[in-house]
Design a protein with these regions (language model features):
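Amphipathic beta-strand/beta-sheet edge segments enriched in Tyr/Trp
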Residues: 117-120
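Internal active-site segments that recognize and position negatively charged phosphoryl groups
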Residues: 106, 114-115
Length: 238
């Protein structure tokens, strides 16, 4: 949240009766009611009861379908906000951890339930791959083989994109160095393995696990700075 740091739901795993509440799985909203409660708690803490003249950024998996985006928009609209900005998690990660220079960029997001590789060209998604597996699926794996298994998933997706790339964008993005995000990028054995296999440097934010949310916040701050100043209201200020 601009000016207030990161604001997270303090009880994301607690339902109204003390049970587990996992409204989003594999990047999809599977329990809209629980998701609405979670968003409501965050909005209460961040915005208070009056959500007028407020802006929310919605970041979604890069290959999220129209049905998922529509469901998410509906939940956010129910909060009473004025405007919702929708962008992919890859664009958010690039905004925070990507280089300032233009050109093609690879974003590798290794999350708990999804692993994604995205090629951005001019800030727009040019190609993407998604594996419906993540860190949670590798629990219990031999630590010595963990980087190899996760790395193989990432490298297979990059190889697939390379084969379909007719303009050399993947090669240019690799020379620049991919942005690594998500919990998998917290592990130096994983990041070192990817750097060796790709033969290039990798780009990491201070806390890769929050790269996407920090990038979304950065974009939100930019939007708020450039939006028109509302006219002054008569009466007592609120």
């Amino acid at each position: 949240m601009p000016g207030r740091g990161l604001l997270l739901d303090p009880f994301p795993g607690s339902g109204p009766h003390g049970g587990a509440e996992r409204p989003v799985r594999r990047g999809r909203i599977v329990d809209p009611e629980s998701c609405g409660r979670l968003l409501g708690r965050i909005a209460d803490a961040a915005l208070g009861p009056d959500r007028s003249d407020s802006v929310i950024v919605l970041s979604h998996p890069v290959l999220a379908g129209a049905e998922h985006r529509t469901a998410a928009r509906a939940l956010l609209a129910a909060l009473g906000t004025t405007r919702v900005l929708v962008l992919s998690s890859a664009r958010a990660a690039a905004a925070y951890a990507g280089p300032r220079e233009t050109g093609p960029l690879l974003v590798v997001d290794m999350g708990a339930e999804l692993t994604e590789v995205t090629l951005l060209v001019g800030g727009l998604v040019a190609d993407a791959r998604q594996a419906e597996s993540g860190l949670d699926d590798l629990d219990g794996l031999d630590p010595a083989t963990f980087p190899t298994v996760l790395g193989r998933t990432v490298l297979d997706m990059i190889t697939s994109m390379w084969r379909h790339d007719r303009h050399g964008a993947i090669r240019g993005a690799l020379r620049k160095g991919p942005v690594l995000a998500g919990g998998g990028a917290l592990r130096s054995d994983v990041t070192d393995h990817l750097a060796r296999c790709l033969g290039t440097r990798v780009r990491l934010a201070d806390d890769p696990s929050t790269t996407v949310v920090r990038g979304a916040g950065q974009i939100l701050s930019s939007v708020l700075r450039h939006r028109p100043t509302p006219p002054e209201r008569s009466g007592h200020p609120r």
